[in-house]
Amino acid sequence: MRFDGGQAGWRETPRPGCTLDQRDWLTRGGSLTAHLARLGRVNVRVTREAVDCPWFDEPDAVASAPRAPMWVREVILSVDGTPYVAAHSIAPLAASKGVWQAMRRLRTRPLAELLYSDPQVERSALVSRRVIAGHPLYALATHALGGARAPHSFAARRSVFQRHGKPLMVTECMLPALWRHLDAHGDGPRSGGPGGGA
């Protein structure tokens, strides 16, 4: 399944200037929650579930009208109590009451439980970009930092999942603590830290 992420700065190849860790995590397939679980104990905190309009760079990706109502789910994924990822997912409102209705009942379970356990779900290519102030994802990520100083930009990725032709798009913004962990410990848990996962 193809996803035209070339609009609004989203692209399949990470931009020059990304570190090796950033290139890896922006293009790594499979469940992001499962990858985070290798670093420590993952917790999912739901910060918002609501009906809303899509962001300016989302309608084309899910083939919807700019003001079409969406079911929106936003969460913070923390590892050992520290926020590592802010995630924003949307599905057309009708689909959220139909083929994607289970996303409304997840509570604090990760969306990955729906996306990677169903053989009828297809995933597009991952696309990524840097987000800066002015993009709604930047505000979401900054809020996830809980008052800590935000960097000039965040690295983010997104992809579209389809089930019976109905889209669900997941956008994931990596927070500074993830890169600090990888710099210090590589792709494994902190020395002596708790393991586990979601």
From Swiss-Prot:
Q: What class of enzyme is it?
A: lyase
Specify the domain of life of the species encoding this protein. Answer: Bacteria
Tell me the Gene Ontology biological-process terms attached to this UniProt entry: pyruvate biosynthetic process; ubiquinone biosynthetic process
Which GO cellular component terms are attached? cytosol
Residues noted as binding substrate in the record, renumbered to the chain: R73, L111, E172
The reactions it catalyses are: chorismate = 4-hydroxybenzoate + pyruvate
* UniProt xrefs under Pfam families: Chor_lyase (PF04345)
- The reply on keyword Repressor is no
A single Gene Ontology molecular function, please? chorismate lyase activity
Q: Pathway, per Swiss-Prot/TrEMBL?
A: Cofactor biosynthesis; ubiquinone biosynthesis
- Keywords linked to the UniProt accession: Cytoplasm, Lyase, Pyruvate, Ubiquinone biosynthesis
Respond yes or no to whether keyword Transport is given for this record. Answer: no
Give the InterPro entries listed for this entry.
Chorismate--pyruvate_lyase, Chorismate_lyase_/UTRA_dom_sf
> Where located?
Cytoplasm
Give its E.C. classification number: 4.1.3.40
Report the transmembrane regions from the record: none
Q: State the similarity comment.
A: Belongs to the UbiC family.
Instruction: Please explain the role this protein plays, according to its UniProt record.
Output: Removes the pyruvyl group from chorismate, with concomitant aromatization of the ring, to provide 4-hydroxybenzoate (4HB) for the ubiquinone pathway.
Cite the HAMAP family for this sequence: UbiC
Q: Please report the name of this protein according to its UniProt entry.
A: Probable chorismate pyruvate-lyase
